[in-house]
Amino acid sequence: MHRNICKKMRFNTQTKIFGLIFSIALLIIGGCKRDGSEQIKVIDIKKEFSIQPWEILKESGSEYGFLIASTEKKCDGTKIRIVPLVSQSDVSINLQAFINPDSCFNTTDVVRDTTKLGLLSNGSYALQINLKDVVLNSGTLSVSDTKLSVQMQSTDGITIPVTDILRVPQGTIWGTIKYNTDQENLVTAFSDSLKTYAHNFSLVNGNYGYFQFIDNSYTPNPTATTTTFTKQKTYFMRLDKPLKSLTNLIQNTKTQLGKNGNLWIMAYNGVTF
């Protein structure tokens, strides 16, 4: 009987020791899992900047760049501090900060700015879009005669609403006339006269930055006036004559419209009427 009691005591002791070891092992494993999850936790960085490829139109010749904007409305007069760096094989855009005005009276819109990349040769460039040199986003910038494209591996702190921008062809003009019904005859006369300087034409489907062209339909991106009138007509044409020859026609039409309408025309070289 004494021998049986000893056996039971040894069994109970062994069972307790095994249970203790098993419990310690579970705690260690559980602790490791928690530590591991903490190590791979992803920090959610607020997306304050919107950035997309852009063609900067100029009379001296267009060049590629980026259009950068805040994702939220900012005080009027806010600016974006941008530091671009371009080499033979690399492009770096460092978004430093929003520079606020001394006083904030209105927050009517997002703040926008462009940064130039110069005359890039066709090919692929290693791209970095960074926030204060702390948050680093890597990708590729591809340049061709007709398009500028961006592919990113990460987009921490930024959004890229448009990844491909097509170049605006030489001789292209586009715009909008908004007017009230009593100006119908004037608008018809302007449209007929415009046809003696330019003709309608089509483009490859895509986003051209300043406008979109899809299935023979032109849609202006929001760069024109937002003034509201009862009627609207859009123009998308290729010049048959020098751009300067349009000046008198456009200015005279604007004068006759007065406060009863608004005419806005932009050209391939950045000139806006």
Task: Kindly give the residue locations of the regions a language model identified.
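Sec-dependent bacterial lipoprotein signal peptides
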Residues: 1-34
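Residue-level signal for the start and early helices of compact helical domains
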Residues: 18-23, 40, 116, 132
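Bacterial Sec-dependent N-terminal signal peptides
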Residues: 24-50
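First exposed extracellular module after export/assembly in secreted or surface-exposed proteins
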Residues: 43-273
